[in-house]
Amino acid sequence: EGTVRERDSKNAKLPTGEIEVVPGKIEVLGRCQHSELPFQINRSREADETQRLKYRYLDLRNPAVKNNIVLRCQVVAALRAAMTEHGFLEITTPILTASSPEGARDYLVPARKHPGKFYALPQAPQQFKQLLMTSGFDRYFQIAPCFRDEDARGDRSPGEFYQLDMEMAFATQEDVFAVLEDVLPPIFAKFGTYDVASAAPFRRIPYNTALETYGSDKPDLRIDLTCKNVSKLFENSEFEPLRGQTVKMVDISDCTLTRKQVEKLLSDCEVQSGSKAYWFKVDEKGELAGGIAKFVTDLRPQLEQVLTLAPNTLVVVAAGASATKSAGVLIKTFGAACAGHMDQERYEFCWIVDFPMYEIGDESGELEFCHNPFSMPSGGLEVLLKAERGEIDPLTITADQYDLVCNGVELSSGAVRNHDPEIMVK
């Protein structure tokens, strides 16, 4: 019991920042067995993980932890409302199912009445939603639990996770894009850290273009940096690490990083990409200096045709078989570190499209499926027949596959399913 009164000093950052309670009587409803708590509740995220899990009921009292659960509830509710508004039916599919080949290992559940046999927990409701499509449910979705026996990733919990799963019958790639471009931006803007999200239509970037321009099929479009292929200039370079290699450069204007900071960032990039990177800069006087400058000075006229080499420009260099991947890491790392090159306060979406249908396998040396073999090849049966007749290179065939990327993170993957047995056989 007590009195609620107005605070003398208000704090607008607190939910109860304008009032306070002056207790008149306190009744203890449950006594603690210990003289002190295992950790401070409002700082539980700083505690040892084992302690947090042991005293999970205390950890969840931390507003920062609790708010994550509340946020998830609000986002899921908003997704349900938006998908329903677009004519989708929420249909819950079975959890206990038969094992089928997927991308990870299955979790198995022993079948009590059938010794030696097992159910599998679904890695994704693929077969069930295909069954729904053939049964006449033309728009399906669910907040689907997915169980995958795989190692933890930086952006995914091990074991299980939930995803917005959807399927559309008689739909084109653009039909799918239209739904998600309408559903996602308002939800990100309302519940996300930033209140600005890309408006529809999102940028469509071909897979090969993404690799050539951004060094990644998950580009962060908030960053204004790109990589340039200058391999031909270094075919006979005096600098052995670049000689005859794939060489990609990223020019960063108005960069004020010190030599020590640059080399620390390059070291971090090397850990991420597994490939050593190099650098040089254009100083205040417009002269090339630092790093590998002495090996590129004679090539400055040619480099200026593809790079901007104004004073105070830093150039970072990736070389070798993994130059593309390394360049992508350089772009994201230096784009975030160099002031003025990253618009952080927004969500920037894009679609990665035109994935190659085939590639040459690293081990087999033969033609193999590049990604999803069950997707529709762009151009259908005719393009496969042209490849069979030798009229086109099979490596030029693209598939109706797509990834949705936001701020350098892959949010989802999808494809137009190959429903034609003749095309599948071919």
What function would you assign to each model-found segment?
Residues 1-426:
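Class II aminoacyl-tRNA synthetase catalytic cores and aaRS-like
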